[in-house]
Each structure stands twice: as structure tokens, then as C-alpha cells.
From Swiss-Prot:
Required cofactor names: Mg(2+)
Subcellular location: Cytoplasm
Gene3D superfamilies for the chain: Nucleoside diphosphate kinase-like domain
UniProt name for this protein: Nucleoside diphosphate kinase
GO terms of biological process kind: CTP biosynthetic process; GTP biosynthetic process; UTP biosynthetic process
Pfam families: NDK (PF00334)
Gene name of this polypeptide: ndk
Enzyme class: transferase
Amino acid sequence: MAIERTLSIIKPDAVAKNVIGQIYSRFEGAGLKIVAARMAHLSRADAEKFYAVHAARPFFKDLVDFMISGPVMIQVLEGEGAILKNRDLMGATDPKKAEKGTIRADFADSIDANAVHGSDAPETAAVEIAFFFPEMNVYSR
């Protein structure tokens, strides 16, 4: 499997629960390296731009409102098969359907307040990483 990078966001609900460290431990325990990280409180414009792919969907406004409701922790993860590995760690979008031991099963409250975001493919990972991190701010270790 190839070394990949993926974007991960710890959403406002999980940041408010003070579980950033527990989530980071899961990333690292799965062999993923955190090669860039920053905390931010997204503006409405940034959240709308980042989630523009969902603009026509009925949940778009609620998603944007949620993502600007508090600070988020944004990180780039790197490792063998990082995209799929992170998605496995996150679990199903709906925490009620997520397997026990996944981030969403353990820390999410609802399908809307679902604790984390992760890129779903190499192409989207590249776009999402570039959105938050200029190349000079991502460091392989």
C-alpha cells in the first residue's frame, strides 16, 4: 500500500468534549503520523467554500452552521493507506450505525454532530489539504 496523506477535521462537538488527545492517540495507534495541525474557528465563508460540493444538498445550511458553531482541529494524517485507515477509524457517518470502538461510536452524538471529517479519496484529500495547509506547512517525519 502507498504512503498517502488525508485531511482530518475534529468537529466542534468533539473539540467541546475535550477529546482531541484521545482521537490523536487513535490516529497514532493506527500508524498514522500527524504532519500538520492547527485549531481554527471557521468563518461562514470558509465553511461554505470547503463544503461547496454539498451546496445543493438539503443538509448544507445545517452543516455549515454546525461547522462554524465552535473551534475545529484540522490535521493532515500521513501513512500507509491513510485515507481508508482514517475512514475505518472514524466509523459510519451515523454514529448509531458505527461499529463499537470507532471515533464516531465513542464520541459522536448524531449524524449531524458526528465528531470528525475525513477525506474520501486521494483527489479530494489533495484539494482539502490544499484548502487548509499551503504545501510549505506540511512536514513528513
